[in-house]
């Protein structure tokens, strides 16, 4: 009786040792490559108030100011790499790039605060529990509420640049604010953020 149980145990144990699959290798290699490329890009960006957006036709890196709607993408990428690797160098990079975004917490001229601040700060809060990120997320959400019109029930996307009467401009990018607003409501217990989100 002991021998058949031992054989069964050995067979089951052998099935638990699974070699790395093609998909697992692909993911690991992709993450390794992303780390190399992102570290190189970060080392080339000496001004923490400029953010990479794309390459021009000649292949040169295009940078935008902190007020660009994509300013949170690069810090968000750094947070994601830290979350996957737990490498302290990614934590340092993510904190440094996210710190520059703090000035956006009172920037009232955009609806893109979820892209710009919510994503990287939300990731920083989730991965570190840092109360400074909690405050920044709530302050930014307060600013975003200033764009909400209760008569319309929406957050205005764009301001009217020529000061002429126009329709209330709303685009799907506003959906990127929902997670930040829900989180602000959860953190503060203030239902206003949630009410605007729904």
Where does each model-flagged region fall?
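Glycan-recognition and catalytic cores of secretory/periplasmic carbohydrate-active enzymes
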Residues: 22-198
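Positively charged n-region of N-terminal signal peptides that target proteins for export
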Residues: 1-4
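Bacterial N-terminal signal peptides
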Residues: 7-15, 98
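Bacterial Sec-dependent signal peptides at the C-terminal "C-region" and cleavage site
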Residues: 12-25
């Amino acid at each position: 009786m002991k021998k058949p149980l031992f054989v069964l145990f050995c067979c089951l144990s052998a099935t638990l040792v699974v070699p790395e699959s093609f998909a697992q290798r692909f993911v690991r290699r992709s993450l390794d490559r992303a780390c190399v490329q992102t570290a190189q890009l970060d080392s080339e960006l000496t001004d923490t108030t400029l953010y990479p957006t794309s390459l021009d036709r000649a292949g040169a890196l295009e940078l935008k100011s902190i007020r660009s709607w994509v300013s949170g993408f690069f810090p968000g990428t750094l947070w994601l790499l830290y979350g996957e690797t737990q490498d302290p160098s990614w934590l340092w990079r993510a904190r440094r790039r996210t710190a520059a975004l703090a000035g956006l917490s009172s920037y009232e001229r955009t609806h893109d605060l979820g892209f710009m601040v919510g994503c990287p700060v939300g990731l920083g809060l989730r991965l570190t529990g840092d109360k400074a990120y909690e405050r920044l997320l709530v302050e930014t959400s307060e600013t975003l509420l200033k764009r909400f019109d209760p008569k319309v029930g929406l957050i205005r996307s764009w301001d009217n640049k020529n000061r002429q009467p126009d329709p209330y401009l709303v685009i799907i990018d506003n959906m990127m604010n929902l997670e930040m607003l829900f989180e602000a409501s959860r953190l503060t217990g203030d239902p206003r953020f949630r009410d605007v989100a729904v």
